[in-house]
């Protein structure tokens, strides 16, 4: 491995991460209780009044809040629709997340495409500019069909939750070459027909493999391409 690649890997490890894992067959309160026990804090409570989405939360030893929320896109009984939303994580937290997922699976949690489950990966957008985000959009547009094939995404999910880069967005993006994030946001929302409610969580523009709505509202670059399956390990 040459020095340049080694440096790139080390820089990647400095990025912040947020993960949303959809599952069913486990109640949100039970998942939060299990997480609190796993973290060794025993602290979990109903936080729906603050977070909405029928949320139960658990706290780890660092005081970070891990949320278990209802997501209507998940199949199954309402009380067992459960989406784990992590706090801001770092590279060294990946093993912690993996072990928590194992605990949830052993407690009965199920997650696969037949249950309407997916994974959303958020990477901190710090350091990105309109230029780097334009580059990323072009790279994604050139490779997302390969990604979809590799991840075996079904056509229904792609048409609803994991849409490819809108060609109108890409055309305007490359024509105007925005110099500010505000100008980039204008192109994003207008091209996706979602100029209304730009600050709304469920703005329709979010349902793309490459989701820049998260960039403008949460400061992350979000990928919606991943199907979810809790595997044996």
What function would you assign to each model-found segment?
Residues 120-124:
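Midchain, well-structured core segments that form catalytic/ion-binding scaffolds
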Residues 115-119:
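Short, conserved phosphate-binding/catalytic loop or strand-edge motifs used
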Residues 1-113, 126-233:
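C-terminal accessory/tail domains of diverse enzymes
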């Amino acid at each position: 491995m040459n020095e340049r690649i080694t440096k790139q890997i080390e820089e990647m490890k400095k990025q912040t991460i947020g993960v949303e894992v959809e599952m069913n067959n486990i109640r949100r309160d039970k998942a939060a209780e299990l997480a609190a026990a796993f973290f060794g804090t025993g602290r979990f409570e109903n936080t729906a009044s603050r977070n909405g989405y029928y949320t139960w939360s658990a706290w780890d030893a660092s005081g970070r809040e891990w949320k278990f929320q209802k997501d209507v896109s998940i199949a199954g009984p309402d009380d067992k629709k459960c989406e784990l939303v992590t706090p801001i994580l770092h590279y060294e937290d990946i093993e912690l997340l993996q072990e928590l997922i194992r605990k949830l699976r052993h407690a009965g949690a199920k997650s696969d495409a037949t249950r309407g489950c997916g994974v959303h990966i958020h990477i901190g957008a710090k350091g990105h500019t309109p230029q780097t985000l334009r580059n990323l959009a072009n790279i994604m547009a050139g490779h997302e069909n390969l990604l979809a094939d590799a991840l075996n995404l079904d056509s229904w999910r792609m048409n609803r939750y994991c849409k490819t880069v809108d060609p109108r967005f890409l055309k305007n993006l490359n024509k105007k070459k925005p110099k500010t994030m505000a100008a980039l946001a204008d192109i994003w929302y207008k091209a996706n027909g979602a100029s209304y409610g730009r600050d709304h969580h469920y703005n329709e523009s979010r349902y793309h493999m490459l989701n820049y709505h998260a960039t403008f509202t949460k400061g992350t670059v979000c990928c919606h391409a991943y199907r979810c399956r809790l595997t044996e390990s």
